[in-house]
UniProtKB/Swiss-Prot annotation:
Binding locations of Mg(2+): D493, D499
GO biological process: mRNA catabolic process; RNA processing
Biological role: Involved in mRNA degradation. Catalyzes the phosphorolysis of single-stranded polyribonucleotides processively in the 3'- to 5'-direction.
Region (Disordered): 704-755
Protein name: Polyribonucleotide nucleotidyltransferase
Gene assigned in the entry: pnp
Cofactor(s) the protein requires to work: Mg(2+)
Residue ranges annotated for the S1 motif domain, each copy included: 629-698
Compositional bias segments (type: Basic and acidic residues): 719-755
């Protein structure tokens, strides 16, 4: 057995070492690279099928990002102690890795390719997302799989007014920008970002500076290829039968143009499918029966190529889109809010034939989503879910768990709105948005952004500004010409070269996602796309503001009411009670839900304000500390010749001296109060040593404040000896309790030292 050869290359990126290593792991994979940045370490493997599956007419690329709990020194908490289904983070990183790799495989290459990225170590400082792209690209680059890479990837932040390369995880939480850019040495391939209203120029500058770092990472991968790269397997793109295309084009005449140029998706699809059926029937009529299936595929492929050319050439040559719009024109928009009864907020956003209904639901802090990514437990108080049912495109498909696409679109809409949400201190509710795509003809994710902003305002959530989104497209020609399209629809997305989604407020960008189908785009194209996106966004915001321009002043009557109080940390146990008995009693009595934070904040979520106030009263009764000047409605629990003892808080009594019972002189305590009476009393003094509380009914009756009493020279009355000895009555000793009361005439027994 030959000795294993290990190859390593390294470079300094943003003050940390990026290392790529091949030859140590997974030798039977077509390509395997370990990428390490700091102490974050990933293994990427790639395997390609030897032949394409028969009948396959698409590129079957699969990218899986596998999170392993051992990477953070944890054991899975489930019953089987094994990793389960992919987390949302794993799915998003899988999609993030797939998008810049896919355009770099040759056209017509239909062999199945599987990329698996496995987490070996996560250091909680360096984001594994960009590193996953680098590792996968390097594995493909050194393999024999046809691939026009390598691809570099980098994360960009914006801290203290400056762009930062690969900010650490703790820093990204404070950053105004979280952007991942990937590209080859020649062009940008993919951008994904969330931002706090950055300008288009700032976003583009972040992409440009990030791409410069990507070039360095590409050079590092090229060094690894020189050390251990395999020769690429031969691949010959399928030969296109242009004569068949020419024959079909001549036979159809201008019928394809007429069929394509219909503003209604269903009509356009019906007309093109009918024409396609005629073409297939005509060009397979003379074929032997056994050749008809193959001939049908050839004719169908040629027809689809002509359809694509017709759509693209009309845009490049004439500036005409299939629905007759100008290149920068947005489809007709209609907006409704409050369309669903009893929900907390709702909005129906329709743009062309894309229609999204977004529902907002407000919940208690206890409704926050608990997230456990690689053993790091966090919570999310804002959640966005995106649903894309089959009827939205007139199709039949099995329903089940959300697909990767649904999760990705939901995450994009979620981060696009994050910048305008109120803080937990301003608005302590948990917020869930659900976008139901009811009809789709392109840009449903951006329609979800618009619908979400509208539904939040309808629900009364105090967002900082409305947010709108629009998707831009791109058509390029072989002669270098290009056209950017505003508000692309389905056919333009499918047959175009770019999907460039921009969301934001009137002040700046809050969300960005760019995917392309070519080998890269230039900064000039991106600058034009940003400019058209801003114009489109402002147009849409104007339409939205005409319906609802600010959050409603009141929450829905069906939304819960949340009130917040602060209790001493040492009172948390008293509020919870033994085994949670006390807090459960409050919840059962009032119908409220109570959530307690470690810092003593208590959130009371109730169906109405009265229930919340009742719960607060009960909580304060358990946790409130008496202070001088506080007024309580107390209950008389004991009467003595020198005054009355009044219970003001659970387990806390104070004494009202006879001189403090009334404005006038009181000879007999029971002339003023009786046992069980409820009276208003003010705390006038708290003994620093014993904690005993002096109360005054007279101060409440006269409206006298503690400050006024002090200025007038009034002092708390001295406590009588009986009260000073310890409360209502001095407790008897155990011997006295056992001895019982003395009989009449019995002399007291002398006390012993041990009594």
């Amino acid at each position: 057995m030959t000795e294993r050869q290990i190859y390593t290359v390294s470079a300094e990126i943003a003050g940390r070492t990026l290392t790529l290593e091949a030859g140590r792991f997974a030798e039977q994979a077509d390509g395997a690279v370990v990428a390490r940045y700091g102490d974050t370490m990933l293994l990427a493997t790639v395997v390609c099928a030897k032949e394409a599956r028969e009948g396959t007419d698409f590129f079957p690329l699969t990218v899986d990002y596998e999170e392993k709990m051992y990477a953070v020194g944890k054991i899975p908490a489930n019953f089987f102690k094994r990793e389960g289904r992919p987390t949302t983070t794993a799915i998003l990183i899988s999609r993030l890795t797939d998008r810049p790799l896919r355009p770099l495989f040759p056209k017509g290459f239909y062999n199945e390719v599987q990329v698996i990225i496995t987490t070996f170590s996560i250091d909680m400082e360096n984001d594994p997302g960009p590193l996953a792209i680098i590792a996968a690209s390097a594995a493909l680059a050194i393999s024999d799989i046809p691939f026009a890479g390598p691809v570099g990837a980098v994360q960009m932040g914006h801290l203290d007014g400056k762009l930062v390369v690969n900010p650490k995880m703790g820093e990204i939480e404070k950053s105004r920008l979280d952007l991942v850019v990937a590209g080859t040495k020649d062009a940008v391939l993919m951008v994904e970002a969330g931002a706090y209203e950055l300008s288009e120029d700032e976003m583009l500058q972040a992409v440009i500076e990030g791409h410069a770092v990507c070039k360095q990472i590409c050079e590092l991968q090229e060094q690894l290829v020189q050390l251990c790269g395999k020769p690429k397997r031969p691949f010959t793109p399928p030969v296109v039968d242009t004569s068949l295309e020419e024959a079909i084009s001549a036979w159809m005449g201008d019928r394809l143009r007429k069929a394509v140029r219909s503003p209604v998706k269903q009509e356009r699809e019906a007309q093109t499918e009918a024409l396609k059926a005629e073409v297939i029937a005509h060009f397979t009529a003379d074929e032997p029966e056994e050749e008809i299936p193959n001939r049908t595929k050839e004719v169908s492929k040629a027809f689809e190529k002509l359809l694509k050319d017709e759509v693209r050439n009309a845009i490049l040559d004439e500036g005409i889109r299939v629905d007759g719009r100008a290149l920068d024109e947005i489809r007709p928009i209609s907006i409704e809010v409050g369309v669903v009864p009893r929900v907390h907020g709702s909005a129906l956003f329709t743009r062309g034939q894309t229609q999204v209904l977004t529902i907002a639901t407000l919940g208690s802090p206890g409704d926050e989503q608990k997230v456990d990514d690689l053993g790091i437990e966090t919570t999310k108080r804002y959640i966005h879910h995106y649903n894309f049912p089959p009827f939205s495109t007139g199709e039949i498909r099995r329903l089940g768990t959300p697909r990767r696409r649904d999760i990705g679109h939901g995450a994009l809409a979620e981060r696009s709105l994050y910048a305008v949400l109120p803080s937990e201190e301003e608005f302590p509710y948990t917020i869930r948005l659900v976008s139901e795509v009811l009809s789709s003809n392109g840009s449903s994710s951006m329609a979800s952004v618009c619908g979400s902003s509208l539904s939040l305002m309808d629900a009364g959530v105090p967002i900082k500004a409305p947010v709108a989104g629009v998707a831009m497209g791109l058509i390029t020609g072989e002669d270098g010409r290009w056209r950017v399209l505003t508000d692309i629809q389905g056919i333009e997305d499918a047959l175009g070269d770019m999907d460039f989604k921009v969301a934001g407020t009137a002040n700046g960008v809050t969300g960005l996602q760019m995917d392309i189908k070519t080998t890269g785009i230039t900064y000039e194209i991106m600058r034009q796309a940003f400019a058209q996106a801003r114009a489109g966004r402002l147009f849409i915001l104007e339409k939205m503001n005409a319906v609802i321009s600010a959050p409603r002043p009141e929450l829905s009557i069906y939304a819960p009411r949340i009130m917040t109080i602060q209790i001493p940390v040492d009172k948390i146990g008293a509020l919870i009670g033994p085994g949670g008995k006390t807090i459960r009693n409050i919840c059962d009595t009032t119908g409220a839900q109570i959530d307690i934070e470690d810092d003593g904040r208590v959130f009371i979520t109730a169906p109405d304000g009265e229930a919340a106030k009742k719960a607060i009263s009960m909580i304060e009764g358990l946790t409130r500390e008496a202070k001088v000047g506080d007024i309580f409605l107390g209950k008389v629990v004991s009467i003595k010749p020198f005054g009355a003892f009044v219970n003001i808080l659970p387990g806390k009594d104070g004494m009202v001296h006879v001189s403090e019972l009334d404005e006038k002189r009181v000879e007999n305590v029971e002339d003023v109060v009786s046992l069980g009476d409820e009276i208003n009393v003010m705390v006038i003094d708290i003994d620093r040593n014993t904690g005993k509380i002096s109360l005054s009914r007279r101060a409440v009756l006269t409206g006298e404040t503690p400050e006024a009493r002090k200025a007038a020279g009034a002092a708390p009355r001295p406590r009588p000896r009986e009260e000073q000895r310890g409360g209502r009555e001095e407790p008897r000793s155990l011997r006295e309790e056992l001895r019982g009361p003395r009989r009449d005439g019995e002399r007291p027994r002398p006390r012993r030292r041990d009594d």
